[in-house]
Structures are given as structure tokens and as C-alpha cells.
Design a protein with these regions (language model features):
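Generic structural signal for short, solvent-exposed loop/turn connectors between secondary structure elements
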Residues: 11, 37, 41, 137-138
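A polyampholytic, Gly/Pro-enriched intrinsically disordered region
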Residues: 2-3, 56
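C-terminal cap of metal-dependent C-N hydrolases
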Residues: 90-138
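Active-site glycine- and acidic-residue-rich loops that bind
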Residues: 5-15, 75
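Fold-independent oxyanion-binding glycine-rich loops
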Residues: 8-10, 34-35, 67, 98, ...
């Protein structure tokens, strides 16, 4: 079968195209970003913002978390060591804040759709180290 990833980058996410694909019953298996210095101030911002954009397109919070964790690990062939929390395995944890607020989600072509929830990174934990989020502009 075909596996599909939403890899939001500077030039490759269109809400118009996404709606057409979703209307035909095709749904992404995972979500990722091409996050770098050139798109952290928009349109990509970060993975939590991209996840919130998918929520604005109709996906649930649980669906986008699964796309960003377990499904992404499976697509990389690494589900044995990442993508879930299990006893005896290393834990990499992102703590996210879900905010009920109105904002405009922006795609790579400057198209917008209304969004009703935002996902904000609070901190991450890896190898017993806490990491604060990078200071970045957010929509």
C-alpha cells in the first residue's frame, strides 16, 4: 500500500490540495515538518503548530498525536525503540499545552483556514534532561 506523510515545509502544504485529498478519503499516516531557521517564523513554525493545522482540517488531537509519534516511528521502521512509552524502553516525552483560541492557520501558499485550538510546546525530556522550547514566533 501507499503510506502518506504530511511533511510541512516552506513550499509543500496547501490547504486547498489537502481538502481535495481528504474529500477523496485519503488520510495521512504521519505528520512531520521540514523545520529549519528559514521557516520557524512561518509558515511552518514547528511540529506542534503543524499538528494544530491538521486539527483545523478536521483531525482530532488523538489522531495527530498518533501521527506524530507511533505512526511516524512505524514508518521509520523504529517502532521497537520509539513512538510510545513502555517499561524498559527509553522515554522521550514532549509536554504540550492545548489552548482553546481562535487563530488563522497559514499554509505554504499563504492560504488560511480558521483554527480553534493551538498546540504549544512546554518542554521535552530526553535522557533525564529537560529541554525548553526554542523561542519562536507563533501564529
Amino acid at each position: 500500500g501507499v503510506l502518506m506523510d504530511v511533511g510541512h515545509g516552506l513550499h509543500n502544504l496547501s490547504f486547498d490540495v489537502a481538502r481535495k485529498v481528504l474529500d477523496q478519503g485519503l488520510h495521512p499516516d504521519s505528520v512531520s515538518t521540514d523545520g529549519h531557521r528559514g521557516n520557524r517564523a512561518g509558515p511552518v513554525y514547528d511540529l506542534p503548530t503543524t499538528m494544530a493545522k491538521l486539527m483545523a482540517l478536521g483531525f482530532s488531537l488523538n489522531q495527530v498525536i498518533e501521527m506524530a509519534t507511533a505512526n511516524a516511528a512505524k514508518l521509520l521502521g523504529r517502532s521497537a525503540e520509539m513512538g510510545s512509552l513502555r517499561v524498559g524502553h527509553p522515554a522521550e516525552i514532549s509536554v504540550l499545552k492545548i489552548e482553546d483560541r481562535e487563530w488563522k492557520a497559514i499554509d505554504s501558499q499563504k492560504g488560511t483556514i480558521p483554527a480553534h485550538q493551538a498546540i504549544t510546546p512546554v518542554f521535552a525530556v530526553r535522557d533525564n534532561t529537560i529541554y525548553e522550547p526554542l523561542a519562536a514566533a507563533r501564529p
